[in-house]
UniProtKB/Swiss-Prot annotation:
This is Ubiquitin-like protein ATG12. The keyword tRNA processing does not apply. Forms a conjugate with ATG5. Residues 1-60 are annotated as: Disordered. It comes from Ajellomyces capsulatus (strain NAm1 / WU24). GO terms for molecular function: Atg8-family ligase activity. Pfam families: APG12. Belongs to the ATG12 family.
Length: 179
């Protein structure tokens, strides 16, 4: 913001001689109207030399989002690397441990392996098959006994975020167990 020069009065003018006097009619307090009387921040006003903060050198390529440009012919190298990392993670198998809640039938073998690229729907179908459920029976599944994931959630993503001892713990019940 540019500072305004202090008001000065000529011998023949009827203008006020100070900023405070000029602000009395405007309803401004002395603090609001006395900005011009404050010392400026240039180098010669106080005798203290101020050095500008140097800009950082950004020599690395900044990552771009796909929405950054309408005409984006290819993905930036960071996006290629991120996609390759995600594909590598979801190409393996993850361990799923089924944990029965009260009043649920117990499986003989509770630990199974499933492809990380599968949806959680596959886990529920597999569990229904192992429990010999009818089409009308309900099975409620909860990850870590905390939440019920959507059927379209990826098993690899759930395992990465909520694994316990490198296993995805899926608690199951025939009746709703958690609100």
């Amino acid at each position: 913001m540019a500072s305004t020069p202090p008001l000065s009065a000529s011998p023949n003018s009827s203008k006020p001689t100070s900023p405070r006097a000029s602000n009395r009619g405007l309803g401004l307090t002395s603090r609001q109207g006395s900005r011009s009387s404050r010392p400026s921040n240039d180098n010669g006003s106080r005798g203290v030399a101020t050095t500008p903060i140097p800009d950082e050198d950004h020599s690395a390529d900044l990552p771009l989002t796909m929405s950054a440009s309408i005409v984006l012919t290819g993905l930036p190298k960071d996006a290629h690397q991120a996609l390759a990392d995600v594909e590598a993670i979801d190409s393996g198998k993850v361990t799923v441990r089924f944990q029965p809640l009260p009043s649920a039938p117990i499986l003989r073998n509770r630990v199974f392996k499933i492809s990380a690229s599968q949806k959680f729907e596959t886990v529920v179908k597999f569990l229904r098959k192992k429990l010999d459920c009818k089409d009308t029976d309900s099975v409620f599944c909860y990850v870590n006994s905390v939440f019920a994931p959507g059927l379209d959630e990826g098993v690899g993503g759930l395992w990465r975020c909520f694994k316990t001892d490198d296993q995805l713990i899926v608690a199951y019940s025939m009746t709703p167990a958690f609100g």
